[in-house]
A protein has these predicted regions:
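Helix-rich effector regions associated with P-loop NTPase G domains
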Residues: 1-86
Length: 86
């Protein structure tokens, strides 16, 4: 099965907006955390000028950058794993 990078980024942003919103804001500027993941990605794309002809947000490029920022630690030392309760 082929994974859709945009769908992964949408889901990542859904988790990130709840678990580490400050890190997202620090990296991408003020974001409306009440939005859904795909809308947050749209907002990030517009802010970073990751747009296609006509000013349409380039979700593919934005998704790649957001996931790369997470993987490379540019969002900080964060993890998606939830520690077990003691």
């Amino acid at each position: 099965e082929i994974l859709d990078i945009q769908e992964i980024a949408f889901n990542f942003l859904e988790i990130a907006k709840v678990r580490f919103p400050d890190e997202l804001v620090s990296r991408y500027g003020d974001l409306d955390m009440s939005l859904k993941g795909h809308e947050i990605l749209e907002e990030i794309c517009i802010k970073k000028a990751w747009v296609q002809a006509g000013g349409i947000a380039d979700h593919s490029r934005g998704a790649s950058h957001v996931l790369d920022d997470f993987q490379q630690g540019r969002l900080g030392r964060i993890t998606l794993e939830i520690p077990p309760e003691i």
